[in-house]
Amino acid sequence: MSTHPIRRGWTVVAAGLERWLGLDLVLLVSRIGIAAVFFQSGRTKVEGWLTVTGTAVGLFRDEYRLPLLDPTLAAHAAAYAEHLFPLLLALGLCTRFAALALLGMTAVIEIFVYPDAWPTHLSWAAPLLLLAARGSGRFSLDRAMALP
């Protein structure tokens, strides 16, 4: 069975990329990249290490207005989650859990806060779904500790 030279050439290139990049590198970059997005967001909600600001509480009260949640509680939960889960992702520890938690947070933001920002939220969901489905990869504490 003969194949077209372009197809054969592309198959060689694709195989080389797969060997050179590998899924483990893709998972590492996904973990670090999405962790940075959420960690930076968390830093905007606090002063010092983890003191939630009045501005953050005000945003949850006046702009975000999440249903069923007290704004002070929501601001604290978001600030702490945006520090803890990115740290877990960066370390590759409890990766699937952290990815699902941030995916849930993304869904809440999309549904209740900024429904028109779906392109941004989709760009967050993509690496989070990859990490939830495939785990943290070889360069992680999950792997070092033989966690799934």
Feature locations, PLM:
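Interfacial juxtamembrane loops and adjacent helix segments
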Residues: 56, 60-61
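Extended, low-polarity transmembrane helix blocks
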Residues: 1-54, 66-84, 88-148
